[in-house]
Amino acid sequence: MRIDAISIGKNVPQDVNVIIEVPVGGEPIKYEMDKEAGTLVVDRFLYTPMRYPGNYGFIPHTLSDDGDPCDVLIINTRAIIPGAVMSVRPVGVLFMEDEAGGDEKILAVPSSKLTQRYDKVKSYSDLPDITLQQIQHFFEHYKDLEKGKWVKILRWGGPEDAHKLILEGIEREKKKKG
C-alpha cells in the first residue's frame, strides 16, 4: 500500500479518510501500519482479553503529539478489513494520557455515502451512553496487564476538538516533511 497516495479526505476536517488497522470485535491483537513500508505489522498481542469497540485506524498525512498519525475509533458494528480505507465524519475526541504522554482518540462515524445510519449523530454526545461507556472502559483497561503501561482518561471533546486535532496533525506532518 502506498500511504502517500491516499488522500486525507474530500472535505477536511469534516470528512476524512481513515486507514483501518484493527477491525471492530477482532482478536485482541494490536496491528499498526508500517508507514514507510506500507504494510500492516503485528504491534503486540493485548494482554487483556478485550476486543476493540469500533474499527480502529489512523488519518494519513497527519502527525499527533505522540509522533504517530492521528488515531481514530470508528463507531460502527461491521468489521472492516485491516488496510482498507474508509471515509468518516469526526464527531468527538477521547482525551487520554498514557505512559508515553498525551494519546487522543478521535471518534468518528462512517460518512453518509457509506451508510445513512449515523446521519443524526453530529457529536459524540448523540451516541448512546452505553456506547461511550464501552469505549471509555476499553481504553481505560486495554493495557492493564502490560507491565509499565497505563492509561488515564482526561475528558471527552466534541467535533470541534476533533477538527482542531486533525488540522494540527496535518500542519505537524507538513512541518516534519519540510
Curated annotation (Swiss-Prot):
Subcellular locations according to the entry: Cytoplasm
Annotated family: Belongs to the PPase family.
UniProt cross-references to HAMAP family, sorted A to Z: Inorganic_PPase
GO terms of biological process kind: phosphate-containing compound metabolic process
Assembly behavior: Homohexamer.
PANTHER family, alphabetized: INORGANIC PYROPHOSPHATASE
Lineage: Bacteria, Pseudomonadati, Pseudomonadota, Alphaproteobacteria, Hyphomicrobiales
The protein's name: Inorganic pyrophosphatase
Positions with a binding annotation for Mg(2+) 2: D71
Binding site residues for substrate: K30, R44, Y56, Y142
Annotated Mg(2+) 1 binding sites: D66, D71, D103
Native species: Bradyrhizobium diazoefficiens (strain JCM 10833 / BCRC 13528 / IAM 13628 / NBRC 14792 / USDA 110)
Reaction catalyzed: diphosphate + H2O = 2 phosphate + H(+)
EC top class, as a word: hydrolase
Gene that encodes the chain: ppa
Protein keywords: Cytoplasm, Hydrolase, Magnesium, Metal-binding
Keyword Magnesium recorded: yes
Listed cofactors: Mg(2+)
Function, in words: Catalyzes the hydrolysis of inorganic pyrophosphate (PPi) forming two phosphate ions.
